[in-house]
């Protein structure tokens, strides 16, 4: 799959990942010998010699090598000269956030890596993999929040590469990963998932600054565990223990690592940075057909489909006048006709409906608005609010000032005309610049916004 990256008016090509020519795979201290008896081959995609499968990144990998990411700097390599400050996170202050999404073998994607800025738009023709990239991000977020692998990947067969063939044990799977930057510097996470014959995580690697901090591998397929080893740097260089194969090990580390040594504290800091970067995610796809009717008064927290938009308007209008004024300005830019206010009315049966105040005594019910107007209004509200107003699961143990909310918007431009998309993108760029919110969206055509300041566009090709 070809990928190019555009930020403003500049474009660069992203080369496919692959190990440098002649460079042998690097292994870390404590790894088992390469031909260790009993190690199940992590060949989840079949025989690499099969027709049409040469070069599949899942082929021929062992438990210890499955997560090697061909291409970029090997996470098992020793830190290079001059990298010590970066490895210790000295030059990476700020809120934890994802800076790269890797789809080594996932659905249509092979060895793909997408750079993520504060506002990133994926664009490309139908079938280029925009939706699957967003699904991978959302799945990682669910795993980071402690969800089981079945909840994170509800449709596992769709995520297995189409041409992947089962191995001798009839296993197939996929592999994804990401990089989270923050106070600890870049932290890499790579996960290998077996989809067939049963769903389980068979390998995981967390690394930072050239050092492997956590590595798991499936040793005994008959048991629901993976063997985990995490960095200790004490009397023993690593600690080994079993972890469940239906949960992300990185999310479990704070419950398993005592933090007594410098090495353990480094592991905890990297794991916490990754989990915080992943957890606060809001997948939003406003459904106009569900937003038109009056809704029961509820929690005032916006759902992913924005069904309860009227209920949230009732809450937000009273809570923050400045934010509401910005929402009214956004509605004025995205809706036809004059807009003096956006509000909610309580009906006789106790339900709530949203209306636009036209300023001349006329109020237009949201049910009368077009699909594009409703989507523009709902997405504007999402960008102007925060985790307290959206149905998300933020890291409650982490101060809000250290968290970043990421909005995932598939089909961001669906139903929007070019002017509405420009207005919405401009609002998103202004909000994302503040650092408390980020947006990863998919659009069918980004030509009208690719030159907008603060907008990064990644072009996908089938």
Where are these regions (language model features)?
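Pre-Walker A-like glycine/lysine-rich segment at the N-terminus of P-loop NTPase domains
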Residues: 2, 12-15, 20, 71, ...
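C-terminal lobe/lid and adjacent interdomain/linker elements of RecA-like ASCE P-loop ATPase modules
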Residues: 2-4, 9, 15, 422-462
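Asp/Glu-rich intrinsically disordered low-complexity tracts
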Residues: 22-47, 51, 55-56, 60, ...
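Hydrophobic positions in the central parallel beta-sheet of the AAA+
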Residues: 101, 405-408
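Phosphate-binding glycine-rich loops of NTP-binding sites
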Residues: 118-156, 371-386, 427
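Conserved P-loop NTP-binding catalytic core
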Residues: 135-196
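Electropositive, glycine-dotted interaction segments
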Residues: 194-325
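Conserved ABC ATPase signature
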Residues: 325, 332-336, 340-404, 411-421
């Amino acid at each position: 799959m070809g990928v190019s990256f555009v930020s403003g008016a500049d474009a660069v090509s992203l080369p496919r990942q692959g190990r440098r020519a002649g460079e042998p795979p690097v292994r870390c201290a404590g790894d088992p010998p390469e031909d260790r008896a009993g190690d199940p081959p992590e060949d989840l995609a079949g025989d690499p010699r099969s027709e049409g499968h040469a070069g599949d990144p899942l082929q021929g990998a062992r438990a210890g090598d499955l997560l090697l990411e061909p291409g970029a700097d090997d996470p098992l390599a020793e830190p290079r000269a001059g990298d010590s400050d970066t490895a210790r996170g000295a030059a990476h202050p700020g809120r934890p956030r994802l800076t790269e999404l890797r789809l080594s073998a996932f659905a249509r994607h092979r060895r793909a890596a997408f750079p993520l800025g504060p506002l990133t738009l994926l664009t490309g023709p139908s079938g280029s993999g925009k939706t699957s990239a967003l699904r991978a991000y959302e799945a990682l977020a669910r795993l980071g929040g402690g969800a089981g692998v079945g909840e994170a990947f509800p449709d596992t067969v769709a995520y297995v590469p189409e041409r992947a063939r089962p191995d001798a044990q009839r296993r197939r799977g996929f592999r994804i990963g990401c990089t989270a930057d923050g106070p600890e510097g870049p932290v890499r996470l790579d996960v290998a998932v077996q989809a067939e014959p049963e769903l389980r995580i068979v390998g995981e690697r967390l690394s930072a600054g050239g050092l492997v901090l956590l590595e798991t591998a499936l040793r005994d397929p008959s048991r629901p565990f993976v063997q985990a080893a995490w960095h200790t740097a004490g009397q023993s260089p690593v600690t080994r223990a079993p972890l469940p194969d239906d949960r992300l090990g990185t999310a479990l580390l704070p419950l398993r690592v005592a933090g007594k040594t410098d090495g353990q504290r480094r592991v905890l800091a990297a794991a916490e940075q990754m989990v915080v970067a992943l957890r606060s995610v809001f997948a939003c796809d406003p459904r106009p057909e569900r937003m038109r009717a009056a809704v029961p008064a509820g929690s005032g927290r916006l759902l992913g489909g924005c069904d309860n938009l009227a209920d949230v308007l009732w809450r937000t209008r009273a809570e923050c006048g400045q934010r509401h004024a910005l929402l009214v300005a956004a509605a004025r830019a995205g809706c036809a006709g004059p807009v003096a206010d956006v509000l909610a009315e309580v009906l006789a049966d106790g339900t709530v409906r949203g209306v636009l105040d036209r300023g001349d005594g006329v109020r237009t019910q949201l049910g009368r608005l077009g699909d594009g107007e409703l989507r523009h209004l709902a997405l504007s509200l999402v960008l102007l609010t925060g985790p307290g107003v959206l149905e998300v699961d933020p890291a409650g143990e982490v101060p809000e000032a250290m968290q970043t909310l990421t909005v995932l918007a598939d089909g961001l431009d669906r139903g929007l005309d070019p002017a509405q998309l420009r207005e919405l993108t401009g609002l998103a760029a202004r909000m994302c610049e503040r650092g408390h919110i980020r947006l990863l969206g998919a659009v069918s055509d980004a030509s009208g916004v690719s030159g907008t300041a603060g907008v990064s566009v990644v072009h996908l090709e089938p």
